[in-house]
Amino acid sequence: MSFPGWGPYPPVERDETSAITYSSKLHGSVTVRDPYSQLEVPFEDSEETKAFVHSQRKFARTYLDENPDREAWLETLKKSWNYRRFSALKPESDGHYYFEYNDGLQSQLSLYRVRMGEEDTVLTESGPGGELFFNPNLLSLDGNAALTGFVMSPCGNYWAYGVSEHGSDWMSIYVRKTSSPHLPSQERGKDPGRMNDKIRHVRFFIVSWTSDSKGFFYSRYPPEDDEGKGNAPAMNCMVYYHRIGEDQESDVLVHEDPEHPFWISSVQLTPSGRYILFAASRDASHTQLVKIADLHENDIGTNMKWKNLHDPWEARFTIVGDEGSKIYFMTNLKAKNYKVATFDANHPDEGLTTLIAEDPNAFLVSASIHAQDKLLLVYLRNASHEIHIRDLTTGKPLGRIFEDLLGQFMVSGRRQDNDIFVLFSSFLSPGTVYRYTFGEEKGHSSLFRAISIPGLNLDDFMTESVFYPSKDGTSVHMFITRPKDVLLDGTSPVLQYGYGGFSLAMLPTFSLSTLLFCKIYRAIYAIPNIRGGSEYGESWHREGMLDKKQNVFDDFNAATEWLIANKYASKDRIAIRGGSNGGVLTTACANQAPGLYRCVITIEGIIDMLRFPKFTFGASWRSEYGDPEDPEDFDFIFKYSPYHNIPPPGDTIMPAMLFFTAAYDDRVSPLHTFKHVAALQHNFPKGPNPCLMRIDLNSGHFAGKSTQEMLEETADEYSFIGKSMGLTMQTQGSVDSSRWSCVTV
């Protein structure tokens, strides 16, 4: 059998002697071969890894660039992406509303502001309006600097913000005065106007200002020479307090715990600034060690007197608000779907009092206080959001708002304001901002602004909900989006997306590129709400984790089988897609049911399930996947681990496979993709379908990529899928973006 026209694959050394011995409850000592362990050495530290990366990049680039549809897709995406989009307005303590805005093809969203009372002047046909406050596109020459978070001081004079480069989890925190906005004419590659404060060694933007606005608390790690590079696990998280205007070396240590190097520590402050909540997380589970202190009675430092909020490792707590000594929390204490409870800091022995009981059929996503005494609750029910309002004092239901909208909501507002802004989006809604005003008896809502995409008629598409049986008989929900005129005759191509883990729900989310895929290829887009997510509460999550992880793969495969049986899909034209934890899904499904799929897209996936705890944040994922060094856990992990369960050479035909990874991904190390692709290419060197790896040398885990880079990736992905499934681009498919794309009411 000769090599396909695009072969052979680049050579890579295979060490048949490399192996690791594990303890198994069922089999005792088990020796597991790891012939590509040398690829665990980071790109910048190994000539072998570097040579592997460069040869694979060249090989994949040659194949992808030879596809004529690639340039057609890129041109279509560029034209279609040139529409204006924005966020809801967020009130801040300096008397302004802030909102994010992109005029089309900017690399990153910019931040604008407008004085309260003048908000009707923004986002009109003449442009964004208001005043440009911060433009991250000016921070770097290549557009790869990203704003990771920001929070304003209570006095409204200072603005703390995080900036990461090239998608790294590592960031620096800076401070600027709100009286020093960016200017449109500023030179790129600089950030003039910021103060001298620079906080380094930060991996999470968790910042809490003190009520006097003199400084803030933050979490950080010890100095490391290789921040943003390598596979070393993040260890020894600490909490510090930074005073404005001082060097980081003078910051005050609040907490450290060298005995538990993998724990992640952070603090929250109540809105009044009086109480500080300390929380330590030892893994990705919904449990923490939580303590509380009164800043009126303590000097900031390591000698603060903390009171236990509850027994450790039983629940997670998020501050909702406070009133005197009463603190409102959202918690899953004896409520796996979360509830709202109160705690009296003056009487800690009394424990928590439930204000809003857990809803057994819906997952509480967020809770916030508005109009002084109204509690706004966002629930996740049947894979979509609901907004309910309760009386803050009694918990009495006051009604549900936006009942007729099926999708997801983002709410912004403050307790002292009677108005909130709500951003709604769904598969067929790119974003609609509503203004809701609370009233004594009943509030009212009005349309504020809506994003529109000229030339793309969203009425040409439809989304439907179906239920299908999984392998064990469990009924699973699935969203299906398609052009209305696509016939259900068993000939349509399908792009199926999944995640299935970490309690992350797959909500109705707008994706212009996905709609273009459906339009141009006359295709169907399917998202099954498989177990492992929180679409149906925490129980749904638990049914897809640890020793029940196989349910996730069974649910996903069953969705594909249902689509074929019900003539939504052609059995020879099904592509699946997943990233990060979803990479476990796509690679496991490809191993277990290779004949079910024609094309598999895996983006920065976790794949070597026996080695994941050794790198980056992998140790914290053991609560989700199990611990490979635990004999009982080893047995169920080894059974599905994609890297260790690739079908052997023989008659198996694997789908066309395209892997995306980033050489400097410091969340999910690229070693997972490197090793898996090397093993696949070894087992199937002359298979009829290609196995390629697209390696980015300039980004990290999803975040921080410029618009241009994202469009380049999408063009590679969609043209690869099209070629693999024999699809023809029906039309240029771009939309006319020459007209204004905002509806004003």
Swiss-Prot record:
Omphalotins display strong and selective activity against the plant-pathogenic nematode Meloidogyne incognita but shows no further phytotoxic, antibacterial, or antifungal activities. It catalyses: Hydrolysis of Pro-|-Xaa >> Ala-|-Xaa in oligopeptides. The keyword Protease applies. Pathway: Mycotoxin biosynthesis. GO terms for cellular component: cytosol. GO terms for biological process: proteolysis. The keyword S-adenosyl-L-methionine does not apply. Pfam families: Peptidase_S9, Peptidase_S9_N. It comes from the Eukaryota. The active site is at residues 580, 665, 701. Keywords: Hydrolase, Protease, Serine protease, Virulence. GO terms for molecular function: oligopeptidase activity; serine-type endopeptidase activity. Its EC number is 3.4.21.26. Prolyl oligopeptidase; part of the gene cluster that mediates the biosynthesis of omphalotin A, a highly methylated cyclic dodecapeptide with nematodicidal activity. Excises and catalyzes the macrocyclization of the methylated core peptide of OphMA to yield omphalotin A. OphP works in a two-step fashion with an initial cleavage at the N-terminus, followed by a second cleavage at the C-terminus of the core peptide. Belongs to the peptidase S9A family. Monomer. This is Prolyl oligopeptidase ophP. It comes from Omphalotus olearius (Jack o'lantern).
